[in-house]
C-alpha cells in the first residue's frame, strides 16, 4: 500500500513555552484584566449584596471550568515542538509505535491532534469532501495506521459506516467527555495519563470490534437497495456528468429517460414519443455528453441538435451548458436573428456540439461549404413540429450531408405519416419508445356527450361555460346590486382557478368564438395556425398564468404548444379520429386530479362517438342504472340532450350579438363556408357505427342536468317525444274514407294480413338494439340471454319468410294456417319477452329447462338436416363471434395487449402509430394531400416531392424559397476582416486560423441592435478619453468621413470657379485672353494687333 507523504508540523512563532500555547496565554491575559477591573469595581461599590457576589463567583468558577475543558480538548499548533532529528524523511508520525512507554510523553500531544482544526488550511478536509458518496472506494489507495488515527475524526463520511457503528462512536465520545469532566480539577499529569489510556482502549476496542452477521446482511441489503433504485448512479455515467445532474436537482430519471438512455448508449437509433415536459431533453443530452467525453483537437462537429424554434434552441443550449460543466466540450448556438459574423467565429473555433434551427444551419452550410461528415450524433427535437413548419427540404438536405455511421435520434409527440416516411428513409433499424400515455384515458376522467343540432352548438357552449363549469354560487336576493357584483367576482375567481380549453375545427371558428365569449363576459384567449408567434406566446402566457380561464384553439396549434394541466375540455367539433380525441383529452385528469371532457355531438357526428367508445371499450348510457351512481363512474360515459328552453334562451343571445357586432356578422358566412369544407375533407365513420347511430335513443335529457330540471320538464319532454314518434296507421289512400271506396277496403284487407309481419320485424329490431347495448333501456349485454335472443331472431325470420310465401300463393286455407301459426309464434315471442324483462333468476331457470329439453331431443331424436338452408348457415357464420362464453372461451391474445403495445419498444411503424391531424384551413388541407396516379390514392405532397426540385430551392430562415447556390460574400468579408477561416474536417486544430476570443455579451445585446450599442459605447469611451488623456481620438465615424469628403468636394468646386478666365468672354484669342486675365481687363496688345 502507498503511504502518505511525511507531514511536518512546525511551530509558527518559535515560542519557548512548552506547556502553554499562544492562544491560552492571550486568554489568560484577558481574564486577568477582567478580574482586575472587577476587583476595582467591587472596591468602589461597597453597597453590593453578598448574594450578588456569590452569583458572580459561581459564574467565574463555571467559566473557568469551561475554559479548562476547552484547553483539555483543543491542542493548538503552538504547543507542538519542532520535529526531532531522529525521525526519517520517509516516515510520518502515523507510523510510529505509540504503545512504547518511552515515546508516550513525546507523542502524547500528537495523538490528540485534530488535523482539520489545528491548521489554517485543512490538510485532509478538501480531500475527504471529494470522496463523498459512491467514490469512497478510492480511499483504499491511502494506507493509514489504524492504531494511531482516532476514527472519530472521520465521522463526516457517514456513508462508509453503519448506524450501529455511529452509535458505538457516540458512546465512546460521551464516555470521554464524562471522564474529562471528572478529572478536570486533578493534576495535569494524571489527566493526561487517563486520557491516553482511554484513547488506547477505544482504539483497541475498534480493532477488536467484530462485525456481526446481522450487520453484514444489513449492509448487503442496503447495497442492493441502492442498486435497485434506478437512479442516474446505475447508468455508469462519468463523475463530472453525474455531479452536474445531481447539482441541478435531478435524482430519479423520468420514464422516457430510464428507457432511452441505456439504448442510446448502446448505439441504437431511436424514435421517442413523448410530450413536452416529460424530460426528453435530458434523455438525449445526457448520453450525448457521455459519448462525446471531452473536446477533440481534430476539426469536425461531432453532434448536432436541430430545434424547430429559436426559443426551444436557446432552452436546449442552456441545458447542454449545465450538464457539460467540468468538461471542455465546446457548444455553440446557431439560430436566426443573431449576426452571421459572430457565428462564423464560433464555427472557426472547432465546436463539438451545434444547437441550431434548420434554416440558419442550412444557410451556413451553403455559405461556408462546411462539412458534417464527422457527425456521430444527430437529434431531431420536436420532429413533428419541424415538419409542420415546413422544414422537410432542409432536413433531407442535412441528412444527405451526414455520414452513414451516425446515430440518429428523433423525439416527437405524434407520428404523422410524413414523419414515418422520413424515419424509414433516414434511420437505421430504429427502436420506437412510445411512453406517451395519451393512448390511455385516465380513470379520473369523466366523459359527457350532448346530442344536439349543429346550429345550437354556440348556445350550448355558452350554457356549459356559464351554468355548469363556472357556476355562480346561489346568494340571497335581498340586495340586488351587491349580489351581481359578488357573482361577477366569484365567476372571475373560478375562471382563474379552473382552466378550460375549447377545440374547434378551423381558425375562423376560433376567431368567432373568441369574440362571442368576450361579448358574453367570459375572458378568453385564442391560438390558431396562422397566429403571429409573438401573439401566440402572449396568449399562452395569459392562459398559463391563470389570468384567463378559457382558451380557444385548433388541433394543429395545440400540438405545437406546451399546454399545462387542465380541468375541463370542450370539443366544439367532435374529432373524426379516436386518437385525436385522446390527444385533446390527454391533459385532463393527470397527476391524481379529476376532470371532465364535454363534447357537443351533432347528428352527423354520432357515428364517430360510437367508434370512439368501441376503441375505448367504454359503455355509454343516457340514464343512471342504479341509485347513487354519478357521472364520475369510470366504466361508463353518459349522453343526452339539453332542454329546448335553455337552448332557445342562449341561441337568442347569440343572434342578438350577431346583429349588434359587425365582426360576428361578417364571420358568420365564413364560418358556414369553412364548416362545409371541413366536412368535405373529414374522413368517414364505419358503416356499422352509422347503422347503430340510427337505433340510438337521443330523446332523453343528460343525467348531469338533474339539478337544472323539474318534474314538469321531464313530463313535457316525454309528451313532445311521443308527438314526434307518432305515426298514424292510415296511408294516403285512406284519406278519403267513404263506404263504397275500393282503395280503403283493399288497405284494410292488406293490413289484416301484414300486421303480424310488421310486429315481428319490430321485435327483431328491438332485440338487435338490446344486443348491441344501444336500445332505449340500455341493458348490459348478458351472455345467458344470447340463446333465447337467437331463437327469437330465428322465429321472426321464419315468420317473415312464411308470410311472404303465403302472400305469393293465393290459397286461403294456407293463409289461415299460417296466421294461426303466426299467432302461436307471437304468443311464444311475447312469453320470451316477458321472460327477458323478469328477474335474472327466472331467466336462468328458463334457460336451464330449455337446455335440458334440447339435450333430451338431441339424445333421442336425431335428425339429418338438408343442405338447402344456405342463408341460415351464412347468418350463423356472421354471428359466430357473438356466441363466445367468457367463462370458457380462451382468447389467443391477452386482455392488456393494447396497453402493453402502447408502452413497449418496437422496430415497426404501423398505421396505429400514425396520427394525422386535420388542418385548420382548406388551403393547408389541399397542399398536404395530392392524388397519385400510380398508387391510386391521395399522397402527401411534401413526401412525394421531387428531390431534384427540392435541392434547387431551399427555404431560408426568413421563410422564403431561395436557390441553393453557394454565395461566399459574407464569409469572404469575414475572412478578410479577421484573417481567419473555418478549417476543413480532419485537420488538426490550429489557433492561428481562429480569431480572437470574443468579449462576453449579455442577452440584451443579441440581434440587430448589437452593433449600434457597441458603436455608442465606443463613442462614449472616446469622449471620455479626450478629457483624461488631453487629446481627441483619431478614429472617424462614417458621418465624419462623408462630411470631410463633401467639404473637400466643395472646396474643389470653389477653386475651379476662381480659376475661370474673365477674358474668355471677349472676342479675342487665347493668348490675349490669358494676358487679359492677368491684368483684369479684356483689352491687350495681342488683341489690338489682331484687330
Curated annotation (Swiss-Prot):
Gene3D superfamilies: P-loop containing nucleotide triphosphate hydrolases. It is an enzyme of class 3 (hydrolase). InterPro entries: DBP10_C, DDX54/DBP10_DEAD-box_helicase, DEAD/DEAH_box_helicase_dom, DEAD_box_RNA_helicase, Helicase_ATP-bd, Helicase_C-like, P-loop_NTPase, RNA-helicase_DEAD-box_CS. GO terms for cellular component: nucleolus. Signal peptide: none annotated. Residues 261-433 form the Helicase ATP-binding domain. Residues 1020-1029 have a biased composition (Basic residues). It catalyses: ATP + H2O = ADP + phosphate + H(+). SUPFAM superfamilies: P-loop containing nucleoside triphosphate hydrolases (SSF52540). Residues 824-855 have a biased composition (Acidic residues). CDD domains: DEADc_DDX54, SF2_C_DEAD. SMART domains: DBP10CT (SM01123), DEXDc (SM00487), HELICc (SM00490). Pfam families: DBP10CT, DEAD, Helicase_C. One of its GO terms (molecular function) is RNA helicase activity. Its EC number is 3.6.4.13. It is found in: Nucleus, Nucleolus. ATP-binding RNA helicase which may be involved in the ribosome biogenesis. Belongs to the DEAD box helicase family. DDX54/DBP10 subfamily. This is ATP-dependent RNA helicase ddx54.
Amino acid at each position: 500500500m502507498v503511504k502518505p507523504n511525511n507531514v511536518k508540523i512546525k511551530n509558527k512563532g518559535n515560542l519557548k513555552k512548552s506547556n502553554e500555547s499562544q492562544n491560552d496565554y492571550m486568554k489568560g491575559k484577558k481574564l486577568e484584566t477582567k478580574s482586575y477591573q472587577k476587583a476595582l469595581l467591587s472596591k468602589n461599590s461597597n453597597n453590593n449584596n453578598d448574594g450578588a457576589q456569590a452569583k458572580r463567583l459561581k459564574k467565574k468558577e463555571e467559566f473557568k471550568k469551561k475554559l479548562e475543558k476547552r484547553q483539555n480538548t483543543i491542542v493548538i499548533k503552538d504547543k507542538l515542538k519542532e520535529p526531532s532529528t531522529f525521525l526519517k524523511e520517509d516516515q510520518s508520525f502515523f507510523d510510529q509505535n505509540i504503545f512504547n512507554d518511552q515515546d508516550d510523553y513525546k507523542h502524547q500531544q500528537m495523538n490528540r491532534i485534530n488535523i482539520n482544526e489545528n491548521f489554517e488550511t485543512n490538510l485532509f478536509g478538501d480531500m475527504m469532501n471529494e470522496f463523498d458518496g459512491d467514490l469512497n472506494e478510492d480511499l483504499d489507495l491511502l494506507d493509514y495506521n489504524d492504531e494511531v488515527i482516532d476514527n472519530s475524526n472521520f465521522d463526516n463520511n457517514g456513508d462508509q459506516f453503519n448506524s450501529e457503528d455511529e452509535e458505538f462512536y457516540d458512546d465512546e465520545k460521551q464516555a470521554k467527555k464524562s471522564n474529562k469532566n471528572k478529572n478536570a480539577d486533578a493534576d495535569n499529569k494524571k489527566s493526561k495519563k487517563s486520557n491516553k489510556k482511554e484513547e488506547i482502549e477505544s482504539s483497541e476496542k475498534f480493532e477488536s470490534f467484530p462485525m456481526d452477521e446481522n450487520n453484514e446482511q444489513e449492509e448487503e441489503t442496503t447495497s442492493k437497495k441502492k442498486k435497485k433504485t434506478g437512479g442516474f448512479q446505475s447508468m455508469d455515467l462519468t463523475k463530472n456528468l453525474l455531479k452536474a445532474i445531481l447539482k441541478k436537482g435531478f435524482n430519479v430519471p423520468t420514464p422516457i429517460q430510464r428507457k432511452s438512455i441505456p439504448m442510446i448508449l448502446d448505439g441504437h437509433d431511436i424514435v421517442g414519443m413523448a410530450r413536452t415536459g416529460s424530460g426528453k431533453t435530458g434523455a438525449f443530452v445526457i448520453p450525448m455528453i457521455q459519448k462525446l467525453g471531452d473536446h477533440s483537437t481534430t476539426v469536425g462537429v461531432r453532434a448536432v441538435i436541430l430545434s424547430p424554434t429559436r426559443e426551444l434552441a436557446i432552452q436546449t443550449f442552456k441545458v447542454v451548458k449545465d450538464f457539460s460543466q467540468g468538461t471542455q466540450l465546446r457548444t455553440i448556438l446557431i439560430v436566426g436573428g443573431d449576426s452571421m459574423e459572430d457565428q462564423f467565429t464560433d464555427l472557426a473555433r472547432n465546436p463539438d456540439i451545434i444547437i441550431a434551427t434548420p434554416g440558419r444551419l442550412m444557410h451556413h452550410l451553403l455559405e461556408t461549404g462546411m462539412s458534417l461528415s464527422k457527425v456521430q450524433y444527430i437529434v431531431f427535437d420536436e420532429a413533428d413540429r419541424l415538419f409542420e413548419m415546413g422544414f422537410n427540404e432542409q432536413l433531407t438536405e442535412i441528412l444527405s450531408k451526414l455520414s452513414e455511421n451516425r446515430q440518429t435520434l428523433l423525439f416527437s409527440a405524434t407520428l404523422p405519416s410524413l414523419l414515418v416516411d422520413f424515419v424509414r428513409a433516414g434511420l437505421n433499424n430504429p427502436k420506437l419508445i412510445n411512453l406517451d400515455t395519451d393512448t390511455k384515458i385516465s380513470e379520473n376522467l369523466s366523459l359527457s356527450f350532448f346530442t344536439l343540432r349543429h346550429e345550437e352548438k354556440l348556445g350550448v357552449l355558452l350554457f356549459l361555460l356559464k351554468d355548469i363549469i363556472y357556476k355562480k354560487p346561489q346568494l340571497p336576493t335581498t340586495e340586488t346590486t351587491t349580489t351581481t357584483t359578488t357573482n361577477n367576482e366569484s365567476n372571475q375567481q373560478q375562471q382563474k382557478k379552473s382552466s378550460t380549453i375549447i377545440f374547434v375545427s378551423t381558425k375562423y371558428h376560433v376567431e368567432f368564438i373568441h369574440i362571442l365569449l368576450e361579448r358574453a363576459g367570459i375572458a378568453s384567449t385564442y391560438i390558431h395556425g396562422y397566429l403571429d408567434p409573438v401573439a401566440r406566446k402572449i396568449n399562452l402566457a395569459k392562459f398559463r398564468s391563470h389570468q384567463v380561464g378559457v382558451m380557444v384553439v385548433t388541433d394543429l396549434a395545440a400540438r405545437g404548444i406546451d399546454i399545462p394541466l387542465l380541468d375541463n375540455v370542450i370539443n366544439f367539433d367532435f374529432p373524426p379520429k379516436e386518437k385525436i380525441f385522446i390527444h385533446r383529452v390527454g391533459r385532463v385528469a393527470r397527476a391524481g386530479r379529476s376532470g371532465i371532457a364535454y363534447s357537443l355531438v351533432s347528428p352527423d357526428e354520432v357515428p364517430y362517438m360510437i367508434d370512439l367508445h368501441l376503441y375505448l371499450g367504454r359503455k355509454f348510457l343516457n340514464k343512471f342504472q342504479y341509485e347513487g351512481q354519478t357521472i364520475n363512474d369510470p366504466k361508463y360515459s353518459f349522453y343526452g340532450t339539453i332542454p329546448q328552453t335553455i337552448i332557445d334562451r342562449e341561441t337568442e343571445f347569440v343572434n342578438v350579438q350577431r346583429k349588434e357586432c359587425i365582426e360576428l356578422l361578417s364571420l358568420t358566412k365564413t364560418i358556414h363556408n369553412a364548416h362545409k369544407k371541413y366536412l368535405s375533407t373529414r374522413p368517414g365513420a364505419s358503416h356499422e357505427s352509422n347503422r347503430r347511430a340510427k337505433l340510438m335513443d337521443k330523446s332523453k335529457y343528460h343525467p348531469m342536468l338533474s339539478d337544472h330540471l323539474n318534474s314538469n320538464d321531464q313530463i313535457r319532454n316525454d309528451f313532445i317525444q311521443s308527438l314526434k314518434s307518432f305515426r298514424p296507421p292510415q296511408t294516403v289512400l285512406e284519406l278519403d274514407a267513404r263506404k263504397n271506396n275500393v282503395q280503403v277496403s283493399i288497405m284494410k284487407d292488406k293490413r289484416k294480413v301484414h300486421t303480424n309481419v310488421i310486429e315481428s320485424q319490430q321485435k327483431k329490431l328491438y332485440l338487435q338494439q338490446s344486443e348491441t347495448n344501444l336500445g332505449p333501456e340500455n341493458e348490459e349485454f348478458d351472455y345467458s340471454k344470447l340463446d333465447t335472443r337467437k331463437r327469437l331472431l330465428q322465429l321472426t325470420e321464419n315468420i317473415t319468410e312464411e308470410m311472404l310465401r303465403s302472400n305469393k300463393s293465393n290459397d286461403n286455407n294456407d293463409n289461415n294456417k299460417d296466421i294461426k301459426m303466426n299467432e302461436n309464434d307471437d304468443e311464444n315471442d311475447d312469453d320470451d319477452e316477458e321472460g327477458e324483462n323478469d328477474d335474472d333468476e327466472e331467466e336462468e331457470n328458463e334457460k336451464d329447462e330449455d337446455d335440458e329439453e334440447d339435450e333430451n331431443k338431441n339424445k333421442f331424436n336425431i335428425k339429418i338436416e338438408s343442405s338447402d338452408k344456405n342463408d341460415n348457415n351464412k347468418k350463423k357464420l356472421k354471428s359466430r363471434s357473438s356466441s363466445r362464453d367468457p367463462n370458457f372461451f380462451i382468447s389467443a391474445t391477452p386482455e392488456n395487449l393494447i396497453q402493453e403495445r402502447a408502452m413497449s419498444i418496437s422496430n415497426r411503424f404501423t398505421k396505429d402509430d400514425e396520427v394525422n391531424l386535420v388542418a385548420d384551413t382548406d388551403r393547408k388541407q389541399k397542399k398536404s394531400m395530392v392524388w397519385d396516379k400510380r398508387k391510386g390514392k391521395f399522397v402527401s405532397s411534401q413526401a412525394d416531392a421531387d428531390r431534384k426540385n427540392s435541392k434547387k430551392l431551399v427555404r431560408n430562415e426568413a421563410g422564403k424559397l431561395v436557390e441553393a447556390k453557394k454565395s461566399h460574400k459574407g464569409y469572404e468579408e469575414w475572412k478578410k476582416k479577421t484573417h481567419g477561416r473555418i478549417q476543413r474536417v480532419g485537420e488538426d486544430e490550429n489557433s492561428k486560423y481562429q480569431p480572437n476570443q470574443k468579449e462576453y455579451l449579455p442577452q440584451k445585446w443579441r440581434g440587430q441592435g448589437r452593433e449600434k450599442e457597441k458603436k455608442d459605447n465606443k463613442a462614449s469611451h472616446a469622449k471620455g478619453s479626450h478629457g483624461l488623456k488631453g487629446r481627441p481620438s483619431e478614429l472617424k465615424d462614417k458621418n465624419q468621413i462623408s462630411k470631410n469628403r463633401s467639404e473637400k468636394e466643395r472646396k474643389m468646386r470653389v477653386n475651379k470657379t476662381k480659376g475661370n478666365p474673365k477674358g474668355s468672354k471677349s472676342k479675342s484669342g487665347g493668348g490675349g485672353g490669358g494676358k487679359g486675365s492677368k491684368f483684369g481687363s479684356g483689352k491687350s496688345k495681342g488683341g489690338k494687333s489682331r484687330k
